[in-house]
A protein has these predicted regions:
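Short, surface-exposed secondary-structure edge patches
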Residues: 96-100
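Amphipathic alpha-helical coiled-coil/heptad-repeat segments
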Residues: 1-31, 183-236
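Non-catalytic DNA-recognition/assembly elements of restriction-modification systems
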Residues: 36-65, 182, 186, 190
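Short, charged beta-turn/beta-strand-edge "cap" motif at the junction between a beta-strand
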Residues: 113-117
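Structural motif
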Residues: 103-106
Length: 236
């Protein structure tokens, strides 16, 4: 099992390194580079635009939609219905009216974004009022933003914008919104997204298989321990 976990970790590291390279430096290694106005993101192609985040998104704060399904923000699956994510139980203390509305295509900054990036909403529903909901002003850029917001350099940027000392930390969007992010030309955004999706289609399949195998091995190990403790299995 340890070997499988090592393989999984290596695959994820290689994937993330490739994504970080593509979303910040592009696909052409020969183009001239410039320093991004947000130093954490390193160098970007000279012809790429830079724009403050607050000019790329509007903030959604709609509430009072109690009939919408409750959503949760996951680092592996994006923003999905709570019913689809069995490993997490969301406790609502103040009723559904106080939860924020999320629409398909929004991006959600959660209390875990400082660890895993900003999540994309694949479903409409309602979510914790503590989260920041961002709607892209130009939806055609969403596919590129999905990659940028989950990249290591951007997560490092998020970690400079946190507030709070509890286990989950808020991202200060008034601070994050003033940070510059790279905006490649539309044609290059499409090329980057296609390149990453095509290159990692097989890798993603291998990652899923490894995750399932590791989960099975852990469950099998727990069953063996339980059988030994309860006397169902003889231990020599």
């Amino acid at each position: 099992m340890l070997e499988r976990e090592r393989e999984l970790r290596l695959l994820n590291e290689l994937k993330q390194a490739e994504i970080a390279q593509a979303v910040t430096r592009g696909l052409n290694p020969n183009v001239p580079m410039k320093e991004c106005q947000t130093p954490m993101l390193g160098k970007i192609p000279v012809h790429w635009e830079e724009r403050k985040m607050k000019y790329c998104f509007s903030e959604r704060s709609e509430k009072n939609h109690p009939d919408e399904p409750i959503l949760c923000a996951t680092q592996s699956q994006g923003v999905i219905p709570q019913s689809m994510y069995a490993n997490r139980v969301v406790v609502v203390n103040k009723g559904f009216d106080g939860l924020k509305l999320v629409k398909v295509g929004d991006f959600v900054i959660s209390l875990r974004s400082f660890e895993g990036g900003i999540e994309y909403a694949y479903y409409q529903g309602i979510i914790s009022a503590a989260y920041t909901i961002l709607t892209p002003i130009d939806p055609s850029q969403s596919e590129y933003f999905k990659l940028l917001f989950k990249s290591y350099p951007f997560i490092q940027l998020l970690q400079t914008c946190v507030t709070g000392i509890r286990e989950g930390q808020n991202i200060n969007y008034s601070l994050l919104g003033r940070k510059y992010i790279p905006i490649p030309p539309s044609s290059e955004q499409k090329e980057i997204v296609t390149y990453i999706n095509d290159k990692f289609a097989k890798v993603n399949s291998l990652i899923t298989e490894l995750e399932e195998e590791i989960a099975y091995l852990k469950e099998y190990k727990q069953r063996l321990i339980a059988d030994a403790v309860t006397g169902k299995m003889k231990v020599c």
